[in-house]
Amino acid sequence: MTVLAHRTDTVTRDALAVLQPGFEGTTAPAWLLRRVGEGLTAVGLFGRNIASPEQLAALTAQLRTERDDVLVAIDEEGGDVTRLEVRGGSSFPGNLALGAVDDTALTREVARELGRRLAECGVNLNWAPSADVNSNPDNPVIGVRSFGADTHLAARHTAAYVEGLQAAGVA
């Protein structure tokens, strides 16, 4: 059930429209469910929120009892940055590996399959891929999360990745 914040409370309403709060644990806390019911439009999930695909599906269903159109966001890049397989490591190649192979059809298919798995669990927004160009090989944050150092390669693979996610119904 969606109950928007009071019409006169524009600050709260505006905040609920743009924030994507996270939380600790594998079930949604009462404060989060209350805010989703009041109009919070999105929730961000991380590895600490996921024990298994089945548990994740139950969590997203729990959120949707308060608001059926809530965006459930996650950072699922494959490779070193995984949430679905956080306990054992990703079975999918990361962006740097995909860029090294430089096959956009493969990148699209990997992203489509990741998107399919996310959608099965009720996740409808992926914060991936990292569209950064790895212009500094010593950058500890981007590194293997980038498709590579070439701007055109990174652009091609970013577009293919987004197409794959969207084909699975994930933004």
Say what each PLM segment does:
Residues 8, 29-30, 103, 139, ...:
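Short, structured coil/loop segments at alpha-helix boundaries
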Residues 37-59, 63-157:
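Enzymes and membrane/adaptor proteins characterized by extended Gly/Ser/Thr/Asp/Glu-rich
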Residues 157, 162-171:
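Phosphate/pyrophosphate-binding betaalpha-module
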